Amino acid sequence: MVCVSNNKSYLKSQHLKIIGQKTLRGKVKISGAKNSALVLLAASLLTDEKIILDNVPLLTDIEKMGNILKNLGVKLHNKDHQLIIDSKNISIQELPYELVNGLRASFFCIGALLTRFGEASIPLPGGCNIGERPINEHINGLRALGAEIIIDRDVVKAKLVKKKTKLFGANIRLNCPSVGATETLIMAASLAEGRTVIENAAREPEIQDLCQMLNKMGAKIYDSGKEKIIIDGVHKLHGCTHKVIPDRIEAGTFLIAAAATSSSITVSPVIPNHLEAVLNKLEESGSKIIIKGNSISIKGNNIKAVDIKTAPFPGFPTDLQAPFMALMTIAKGRSKITETIFENRMNHVDLLNQMGSSITLKNNIAHINGVKKLRGMTLVGSDLRSSAALIIAALTSKSVSYVYGLEHLDRGYENFEQKLSKLGIEIKRQITKQTINKSKNRSSNSKLKEVSEIRAA
């Protein structure tokens, strides 16, 4: 319970009103992958020819990345889910902090700009508040390719070493299979002189999508999707047309929502092997899964407790840890969820407990005793995936829930509530202005009414 006082802090005015205990039924059209589209936008900086991207999701993160490119002089033309990108006349300049703040993917631009123009200045990025996501791997890798890098007042400034006109190939071994570092170094190496070998590379599908587009542009990249990636640098890259892969995280979120509500739905288009770890756990927890071509159907039933441990691809994705925890709160039995990727990605635990779940948390390991039902509440999501988890929990609850923090949700889910509505859920985006006290202390002098408002730290 948070007491409202005269020291007002206005929440974002939009929220979702959700009527719980409804069954999902029907088909969901899965959008293009956010995490792929963002890096493909950065990769468009590698050429002075036009890039046409199809199946681009309509998300606030994509809009932010587009604004970053525009600030550099890139011309963008968008129509529905297609983006035409013209990076011919780029002006190399330090990006304003207000543009990159809140979007970690903005840092992907450094590899592309450095290898094409010989210099780049990018402020340290933001993103969801889910823990430290250091850029050491990016910087060490770029230095191995021949870059001089300094960090001056939270701005990363990179340039070629003296008397060099290009980056040069190198053997690089990452200390951990960082997705962002792997993508940054692939882009930088694509126009470098000679061969680059990246060992302990990340294997995520979004990296494979990046490499497929770069190869269409004339790059020579081998073994993407494996732990060792080989890049032979080329002199120039040209334009191409490329379709963004389906969003495996969005698909997984809807599948988990169906399992949590004992529902039957079909998601498509998807690439089923991108979701293998998730599908295995859903089957283990009692759901029936049917794969046909580029579609996956699920029939949820009798939720059983299962343990998960997040891991780099092809392991269980950290982006679905929070939604899966919402499922496990109403499972029969005890389960354990271990987060190994980010050290601060359990903000949803307190919120789920306020809804009636039984979760104890220690050292990024959540121990969950399943309960029969959760109760509806007014909640504020603190990051993208925890917001999705709260919505799933609200779908299973006994009453009405109000979920705030939609600025997080809109970063990564396109038309989320509309898609749920088409499946039969009573959900509506509403606009109001409510206030909460920034302090967690109860104020006896408050003249404003108390609300059941819980916010993740």
Curated annotation (Swiss-Prot):
Family: Belongs to the EPSP synthase family. MurA subfamily.
Modification 2-(S-cysteinyl)pyruvic acid O-phosphothioketal, positions: 128
Enzymatic class: transferase
Amino-acid positions noted as binding phosphoenolpyruvate in the UniProt annotation, renumbered to this chain: 34-35
Pathway, per record: Cell wall biogenesis; peptidoglycan biosynthesis
Residue spans of biased composition, Basic and acidic residues class: 447-457
Entry's Gene Ontology BP terms: cell division; cell wall organization; peptidoglycan biosynthetic process; regulation of cell shape; UDP-N-acetylgalactosamine biosynthetic process
Protein name: UDP-N-acetylglucosamine 1-carboxyvinyltransferase
Domain of life: Bacteria
Catalytic reaction list: phosphoenolpyruvate + UDP-N-acetyl-alpha-D-glucosamine = UDP-N-acetyl-3-O-(1-carboxyvinyl)-alpha-D-glucosamine + phosphate
SUPFAM superfamilies: EPT/RTPC-like
Record gene name: murA
Residues that, per the record, bind UDP-N-acetyl-alpha-D-glucosamine: 104, 319, 341
InterPro entries found in the cross-reference section: Enolpyruvate_Tfrase_dom, Enolpyruvate_Tfrase_sf, MurA_subfamily, RNA3'P_cycl/enolpyr_Trfase_a/b, UDP_GlcNAc_COvinyl_MurA
An MF annotation (GO) of this entry: UDP-N-acetylglucosamine 1-carboxyvinyltransferase activity
Subcellular location: Cytoplasm
Function field: Cell wall formation. Adds enolpyruvyl to UDP-N-acetylglucosamine.
